[in-house]
Amino acid sequence: METVIATTGLAMMVGLSGIGSAIGLSMAGSSVLGMIKKKPEAFGSALVLSGLPATQGLYGFVAFILYSGDVKTGITMFHAAVVFGAGLAVGLVCFISAIQQANVCSSGIQAIGGGHDAFGKTMILAAFPEFYAILSLVAAILMKGLL
């Protein structure tokens, strides 16, 4: 049972963060496609902004790598609970922050398409939801110290 709980935690780390990144990337990418109709020369800036939600999936994968070696048969319930908790924290925070970051990036991309100089401002604002994804990864790293 403990192995199942821990493996579920691993699955949440990589699964939820990856799903959030995929949703975020498609949201921001759709905004780029709308923007290039109006201002095709701004594709490079919009491309950078549309790729930002991908990082949450990477954080989930890093957490997965950190914990995957600890999950084996015969682990304790406490050990399994730590892995599950870390998976829940990283998975959910990265899932939500990727989508919310995509909202910020999409708005910035639309502003760039409207002729506004919004690239730098959008990068700054997009860093706010990113911070919480990083914080969840740091928390998972610190939780690993409990094992």
Label for each model-derived stretch:
Residues M1-L147:
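Hydrophobic, small-residue-rich transmembrane alpha-helices and their short perimembrane loops
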